[in-house]
């Protein structure tokens, strides 16, 4: 009889865990169906909304691809592809990314490698239809993705702040980009990353279950602030859209999913 009670207890526990798992997984929203760009809009600096200049953004092999096959030069053609079906405020974002191939030389210097393995995800982005024609970056917070060349340290999941300001350890970050504490990823392997975003209060960047960057008090201001938001300097940035960046190096994105938090 005792064994039967123990068995029943274990069975109930396993059923509970199973239900919890199902309930949790059902809260995740997939932003990319692996087949199309339904729900996404793109904006490339110098071009109108949804003008996919030189077919920069494509779908293939179940991924969103940023490609530069048709480019001879990267002439500040900063691009972003936005999930515009929904704004997000408090959320947990997960995605995988992978750099591949060679970057496109910048028009400033054929040997300028600043955009080598350089991309990112923009959090709390403005809507792309608000962006000016030549605007390089949406007002947002960037989780910057960088990759190494096999030589020097180059952490990923850094924080950049186009049109925004943040505090790190209670002090305003004075640099536009601040390095995380992550390791350098030199290969072209897939990298799984996470972001925990709590409105304007705090954001955490996570890789391999390790929090490598945290910042708080997200607000409008700083460099790259669009003239559309000048009157908002100092105001909290509480919510926005999610966008992926094209900055001169081929990259793929997949498994892009969000769970909204209370």
Give the location of each predicted region.
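Bacterial Sec-dependent N-terminal signal peptides
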Residues: 1-26
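Carbohydrate-interacting regions of secretory-pathway proteins
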Residues: 19-262
């Amino acid at each position: 009889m005792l064994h039967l009670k123990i068995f029943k207890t274990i069975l109930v526990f396993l059923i509970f865990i199973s239900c919890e798992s199902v309930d949790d997984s059902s809260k995740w929203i997939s932003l990319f169906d692996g087949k199309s760009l339904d729900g996404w809009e793109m904006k490339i600096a110098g071009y109108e909304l949804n003008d996919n200049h030189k077919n920069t953004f494509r779908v293939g092999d179940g991924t969103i691809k940023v490609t530069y096959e048709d480019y001879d030069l990267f002439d500040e053609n900063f691009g972003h592809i936005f999930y515009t079906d929904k704004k997000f405020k408090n959320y947990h974002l997960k995605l995988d990314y992978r750099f591949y191939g060679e970057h496109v030389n910048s028009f400033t210097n054929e040997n300028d490698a600043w955009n080598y393995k350089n991309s990112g995800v923009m959090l709390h982005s403005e809507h792309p239809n608000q962006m000016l024609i030549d605007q390089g970056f949406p007002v947002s917070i960037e989780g910057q993705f960088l990759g190494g060349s096999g030589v020097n340290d180059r952490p990923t999941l850094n924080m950049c702040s186009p049109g925004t300001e943040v505090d790190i350890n209670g002090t305003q970050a004075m640099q536009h980009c601040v390095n995380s504490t992550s390791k350098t990823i030199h290969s072209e392997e897939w990298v799984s990353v996470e972001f925990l975003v709590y409105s304007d209060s705090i954001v955490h960047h996570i890789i391999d279950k390790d929090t490598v960057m945290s910042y708080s008090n997200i607000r409008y201001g700083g460099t790259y602030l669009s003239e559309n938001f000048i009157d908002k300097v100092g105001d909290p940035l509480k919510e926005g859209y999610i966008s992926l960046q094209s900055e001169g190096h081929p990259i793929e994105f997949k498994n892009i999913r969000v769970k909204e938090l209370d």
